[in-house]
Amino acid sequence: MQTAPDPKDYVALPPPKYGGPTAETSLTTEPSCKDEARIGQKNSLTRVWGQTGSRPVAPKDLGFASAYLFGAVCPSAGKAAALIMPICNTAAMNHHLSEISSQVAADAHAVVILDGASWHNSRGLVAPSNITLLALPPYSPELNPVERIWHYLRSHWLANSVFRSLADIMDACEMAWSRFATNDGLVRSLCAVAWAPASSAL
């Protein structure tokens, strides 16, 4: 049986870019994780139920419009923060970090696990003082619980769909994330890990 990954084994992003608390600071830690997903008109297909002998039909769009869903969760605090953006870059990342920061308790400091995407460690990235970013090892998306969220959202609410416009895509993303974030049991089952157990309030 594999043991859960320990955040202490992760590589920290360059400290000059991120102003975290000093060693003497006594704050509650909110272990969190974040990621981004592209949702667009070139949508994914998933399996569906059908009668024996039938061949279910799934629509497929040839358009190129897409949006990006920025998502973060803190299972131990029972929090989820998301933004839907038309582009994925450093500016969008800064907006999402601000959203995460606004949900961190006054007596807490968030440690956010994330992958090595270029906008996660660019020079223009400004992390709020109540957030420290920890980078996952390269090519290890399976270590990020948020990846499970994207798979669930696509397979249950976003796949096998045709979106007429960017506005439709963003509306669908908002609907899917809201259904996930307001389902306490789903947040617990998808995102809780040994280093970030589900809150007893969930």
What residue ranges belong to the model's regions?
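Short functional hotspots at interaction and active-site rims
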Residues: 1-202
